[in-house]
């Protein structure tokens, strides 16, 4: 390690370590919701939920009520309602699900869980199937920079961030609150969920939740092999999954909040094989465990200064076995660890100007069970620093940020990946065209640098320590509007957003699945992505007790290989990127039984960058139907719900040779007190 770099790193670590104890009177972190701060001499009032039409960058928000009204059954299902998202899904409950946004790839999508970024130094991809919709209070996708500048530097280090906010704890109600739910469904699905929460005192609240999911996932599918058509059933796809959380929120003073979380996840599952020719045989098994603890503190230091601190330790294990491997059992296990800390200092000069400085440090390491897994026992020091300025008056909002990224790579054995550093600028603005109308134009630019993951650098046979990092540029121009008003008894509101974008990736690393656990990496070089996203949300309340909601979204993205004009792959669409995708939903709430119908679909995709003849994955469209009703008496509430997914039993694939389930049903009973 360079001596000058080492001194700078140690100095920054000392500064962060000094700030965190000083902030032992901090706030519970919350990146989706803006807060209201009363400062000496100035009052800064921000909305509880930032309106999507006012954001300087594309910002899509779904809250708990939206999940119920739109028939959302899991996090992946919710993301189908957001434009610009591409999901990779291996099918069935508990199947691995990853998210890419606007053609950038899943490694460029950050996932934030209750204000702290999740990490996976091995693959760089976050499996969103781990996070139960039953415990989620809100989902938000930010493409570019969020208008809330008081965030960790890591949260600004990706082109897009998916924020998951869990259910909020009670504030001053001293009574215990209990939620119990049971889900059963097709293909052996059974999933109980329980949550207990209570405000022990006016300043201390605790919550605990636990969930277990079992599924056979033995759904039928049709196998077509040239002229032969047979009815088959998915095999070797069983899963046992459980997760638990403990949460605490403590307010020692009027201006200080401390939050703590302990999290554990365990999934023991069989991995179904690729459907090839006449078989989908598989002997692969994977057990994944993840545990982390995090502490967040937030406090108002003086009239205009606020401080936030985060400390987190994360541990993850993946134990993979293939009992049908040629020559004997193939055993590949991995263990990764991360120590992470962050400090952010916010200065609110007045009602218009605000400035933030954030510094994050992380240490990651990874080791495998044998020399055939990860070579060299790599580790990495990461230092991220961001400086942000925001200006906001009645009609104009402007935001500028400069992010400094430093990655120091090493390995206990053998060669290591090179060290990397970069300055990444971003700027965005939103302007209200008419003072009396919610009509806005917005524009943004963001440059981001992504270091290769440990798999990309060190994986046996697939990784390379000489692999070039990815550099991305994204430009967005859009218009948003919202009209109408809503009262308790009647009203009509319409919200529309339209964004066009240009993205560029240099030295793009594209992952193509070799099987469900191992991916091969191909360095494409240059990629150009042109696209457009549109959303519409209409709410009509003709009279009390009746409401109709209509939602829709559409995405166009042309993600082209632009590396070499002489190559036969020049201008070809990148693997797994559909050119067109859409989603829609209609909900009718009434005094009897609420009903929702929804649908989504994509056009054809290629599973490889070479577009080999006969490998194209057909497009698909899927529809779902939901009926639900709630009954309340006193403090008690009982909810019943029936979901039918893939209503017309269409067979399709999101990942090549991994068929998705056909028509299925799910019954949920929930009790609250």
Regions found by a protein language model. Give the residues of each.
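Flexible loop and strand-edge segments within Gram-negative outer membrane beta-barrel domains
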Residues: 27-28, 217-221, 230-242, 249-340, ...
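C-terminal beta-signal and adjacent terminal beta-strands/loops
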Residues: 550, 601-608, 616-618, 627-673
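Extracytoplasmic beta-strand/coil segments of soluble accessory domains associated
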Residues: 76-117
